Design a protein with these regions (language model features):
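N-terminal, active-site-proximal structural segment of metallo-dependent hydrolase catalytic domains
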Residues: 1-112, 195-199, 219-220, 234, ...
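Metal-dependent phosphoester-hydrolase catalytic domains
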Residues: 2-12, 125, 133, 137-144, ...
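Beta-strand-turn-beta hairpins that frame and shape the catalytic cleft
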Residues: 16-24, 145-200
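Catalytic metal-binding/acid-base residues of hydrolase active sites
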Residues: 30, 75-76, 169, 243-246
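A solvent-exposed, charged loop/short amphipathic helix patch at secondary-structure junctions
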Residues: 34-52, 174-212
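Second-shell loop/turn segments in exported
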Residues: 44-48, 67-72, 205-213, 239, ...
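Structured beta-strand-rich core segments of catalytic domains in phosphoester-bond hydrolases
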Residues: 71, 75-176
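Acidic, His- and aromatic-enriched active-site or binding-groove loops in soluble protein domains
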Residues: 90-101, 184-190, 261-264
Length: 380
């Protein structure tokens, strides 16, 4: 059987199947909940057969791609996931939160998890810095819409590596206007009663922007947490998950902020103006996170960058429109162009066959996202 049956196209230059290579994957499980529990609504319960098909699909995916470290999103039932991962040799498991019981057997707010073939040294839930939350003008109640997991994994020949799993705020607007404005006094001017269509459009416009602001704040505050950790403990970084937006969109800018993006006046004001260009770039490089796909095409297809970017496979479809929402970001230890790197990206797969060529019998209970898989080769 072809080694890429879960991918609709071979996007990569396949590396030698070297056992010392490290394979990383991020998988949105799409309502991974064991019956008789329900997700969001009492009608959303898998039958035993449907649940078996769902577990089988993910088991086959893990068996085929053989990842060493996997970040999962949309976990309602961690125990069955832990068992499924263990069956595939991913015997170390981390989770920092649990789904919320709404009533009886109905759950909402699924969480993220990580499974690893290698020992997990430490597990931590990232919390936003309260001082920065205040400085950004956010509510003191601000928190990540889903807790961010950091697991420090002991990777052979690399050592301790900080692996972050995220599921940023979705684009779905979660805003409902009150039928009557709150705090209205008798002396206040009368408010125009909105028609159904204008009320809906208003809720959508405000709700989408509120979601974007939440997602952007999550990205910036997480970037700060990663920076602070890198400054104190210089472990390599792998950040993976469902970002619910394109990296090229402004909301997620913070995650890939680089030294060359900074204004010279800001650099001088920070007391770094005395550094040469080369020294300054070296200082900032250690805090840089890069899209694994960009690292892959730069190292393996340098003459074909524009074509590779234009033909990147989507990881999610809204109707006919595809978007890349699922990412694996890597620190400079995995950048082939950095002389200090420990490994480089030699393969990149978007496992999208079930989205672009679905077969009901096989794919009906899979996922609405394409898992993303990368292979890292250790530098000799």
């Amino acid at each position: 059987e072809s080694p890429v049956t879960f991918a609709s196209q071979q996007q990569s230059i396949s590396a030698e199947n070297c056992h010392s290579n490290i394979r990383i994957a991020t998988i949105n499980l799409f309502n991974f909940i064991e019956p008789p529990l329900a997700f969001y609504d009492f009608e959303n319960i898998y039958s035993h057969g449907q649940w078996q098909k769902k577990c089988q699909w993910f088991g086959e995916l893990l068996n085929q791609y053989h990842p060493d470290i996997v970040g999962f999103q949309e976990v309602f039932s961690p125990e069955p996931l832990k068992q499924l991962a263990t069956q595939q040799g991913l015997t170390h498991f981390a989770i920092v939160d649990s789904a919320t019981l709404v009533s009886d057997y109905i759950y909402q707010s699924p969480v993220v998890a990580l499974a690893s073939r290698f020992p997990i040294l430490e597990v931590h839930a990232i919390e936003p810095d309260a001082h920065l939350v205040a400085a950004m003008g956010l509510s003191s109640q601000f928190t990540f819409s889903r807790k961010v997991l950091r697991a420090t994994v002991d990777i052979p020949q690399i050592g301790a590596c900080d692996c972050y799993v995220v599921h940023f705020k979705s684009k779905r607007p979660g805003l409902a206007l009150e039928p009557h404005p709150l705090g209205l006094t008798l002396s206040a001017p009368p408010t125009l009663a909105l028609h159904s269509e204008t009320k809906l459009l208003t809720e959508q416009a405000l709700g989408r922007w509120a979601s974007t602001m939440q997602r952007g704040a999550e990205a910036a505050l997480l970037f700060h947490a990663i920076l602070a950790r890198r400054q104190s403990i210089r472990y390599p970084v792998i950040l993976m998950g469902d970002f619910n937006d394109s990296l090229s969109m402004g909301a997620l800018d913070a995650l890939t902020l680089q030294g060359e993006h900074l204004h010279s006046n800001d650099i001088k004001a920070a007391g770094l103006g005395h550094l040469s260009d080369i020294a300054r770039l070296a200082v900032f490089a250690q805090y840089r996170l890069q899209d694994a796909y960009e690292l892959f095409i730069a190292a393996n297809m340098p003459d074909n960058l524009v074509h590779s970017r234009e033909h990147r496979a989507a990881t999610h479809y809204y109707g006919p429109k595809g978007s890349v929402l699922d990412y694996i970001l890597l620190s400079n230890e995995f950048d082939a162009s950095d002389s200090r790197s420990l490994a480089q990206v030699v393969d990149y797969q978007t496992c999208d066959r079930h989205l672009v060529r679905p077969e009901y019998e096989r794919d009906a209970y899979s996922t609405d996202h394409a898992p993303v898989w990368v292979e890292l080769s250790l530098r000799r």
